[in-house]
A protein has these predicted regions:
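Charge-dense, helix-prone N-terminal extensions
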Residues: 1-124
């Protein structure tokens, strides 16, 4: 198994820990969705590449901070997505990237329920 394939498996495992996440397809390639909405997909046009939902400000920061791992093509410039080289991205960055992408596409109620469940419980 290649590093890119292992990284994609790790991304799927991380994503599936979040509520409402399901694996599916998009444009004929493996995809990660939340309640049917696209969160990420493997890019068939770039082996080892992943398109991940990402807001524009964070995208600019990622492109500047780690250009070896993050990139953009003209097709994606107007979409809130970042392209990731799976064999170059730092795996310790994945949990936060995945959760932020999930928050962008998950229904507000699902996010609120997740936050309430994840919040530290107060002792009485």
């Amino acid at each position: 198994m290649t590093d890119a394939a292992q990284t994609y498996e790790r991304i799927c495992a991380l994503a599936l820990q979040l509520p409402g996440v399901e694996l599916g397809t998009s444009y004929g390639t493996p995809a990660i969705k939340v309640k049917g909405k696209l969160m990420a997909r493997l890019r068939s046009e770039a082996e080892g590449g992943l398109a991940l939902r990402c807001d524009f400000l964070e995208r600019q920061m990622l492109l500047q901070a780690a250009p070896e791992a993050f990139y953009l093509t003209p097709h994606y410039k107007d979409y809130p997505m970042i392209l990731i080289k799976l064999d170059e991205v730092r795996t310790d960055a994945l949990p936060d990237l995945i959760e932020r992408a999930w928050r962008m596409v998950a229904p507000k109620r699902l996010v609120a329920a997740y936050d309430a469940e994840s919040a530290p419980k107060k002792k009485r």
